[in-house]
C-alpha cells in the first residue's frame, strides 16, 4: 500500500500528489508538486526482490528504495528473525557494487503533514549528484549488536529531499541543504 503511494509521489502522479499534500504546509506541498516536473520512472518489485521494494530512475539519480510503515516511531531491523537486517545488508552490498544510492523510506501511519522520512547508508562507489545527496541524508542508526534501526524523527523529510534533488540554479545539493536547514532552524 505505502510502496504504491511513494511510487506515485516519485512518479509525479498529480492525483496522488494532490491527495497526500492536503494536510501539508505550503513549503512541503510545493516540494511534492515539483515531482510533476521532475518525475522518476519507478518500478515496484512484486514480492520484493529481496533487495528493495522500489527502483527509481531518472537522468540524474538512481535509487533502490526499501519502504517501511509503522504507527510507532522506531523500526528495529533485527525484528522479524533478522530478515530485514539481512535484506538491508544485501541492499548496501549491491548498491556499493553498482554505484546506486540506497534509500530507506519510513512512513509514519496517521501523521498529518509530510509523513515520510528518509535514511540511507554510506556508499563509497557513488558519483555525481548521488554522492552529494548521500552525504546529507541521515544514515541508519546502529545498535551495539550491529543491527540497523530507524527513529522517524531522525530522518530527512521527503519534502526536503525532493526540494534538494529538484532544485535549479546550479547550487550543489549540500549548498541547498544548508539553505533548507537555515530556514528550519
Language-model regions, residue ranges each:
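Short amphipathic alpha-helical segments and helix-helix/interface helices
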Residues: 7, 88-95
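Acidic-basic catalytic patches of nuclease active cores, encompassing PD-(D/E)XK
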Residues: 1-46
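Short beta-strand-loop-alpha-helix junction that forms the active-site gateway
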Residues: 67-81
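Substrate-gripping "pore-loop 1 plus following alpha2 helix"
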Residues: 79-90
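Intrinsically disordered, low-complexity terminal regions enriched in charged/polar residues
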Residues: 114-185
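Nucleic-acid nuclease catalytic cores
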Residues: 92-126
Amino acid at each position: 500500500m505505502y510502496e504504491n503511494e511513494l511510487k506515485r509521489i516519485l512518479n509525479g502522479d498529480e492525483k496522488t500528489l494532490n491527495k497526500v499534500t492536503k494536510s501539508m504546509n505550503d513549503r512541503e506541498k510545493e516540494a511534492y508538486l515539483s515531482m510533476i516536473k521532475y518525475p522518476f520512472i519507478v518500478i515496484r518489485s512484486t514480492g520484493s526482490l529481496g533487495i528493495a521494494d522500489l527502483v527509481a530512475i531518472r537522468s540524474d539519480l538512481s535509487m533502490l528504495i526499501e519502504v517501511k510503515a509503522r504507527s510507532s516511531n522506531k523500526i528495529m531491523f533485527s525484528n522479524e528473525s533478522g530478515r530485514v537486517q539481512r535484506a538491508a545488508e544485501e541492499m548496501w552490498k549491491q548498491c556499493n557494487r553498482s554505484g546506486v544510492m540506497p534509500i530507506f523510506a519510513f512512513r509514519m501511519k496517521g501523521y498529518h503533514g509530510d509523513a515520510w522520512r528518509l535514511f540511507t547508508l554510506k556508499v563509497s562507489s557513488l558519483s555525481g549528484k548521488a554522492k552529494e545527496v548521500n552525504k546529507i541524508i541521515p544514515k541508519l542508526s546502529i545498535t551495539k549488536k550491529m543491527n540497523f534501526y530507524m527513529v522517524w524523527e531522525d530522518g530527512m523529510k521527503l519534502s526536503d529531499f525532493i526540494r534538494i534533488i529538484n532544485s535549479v540554479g546550479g547550487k550543489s545539493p549540500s549548498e541547498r541543504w544548508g539553505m533548507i536547514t537555515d530556514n528550519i532552524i
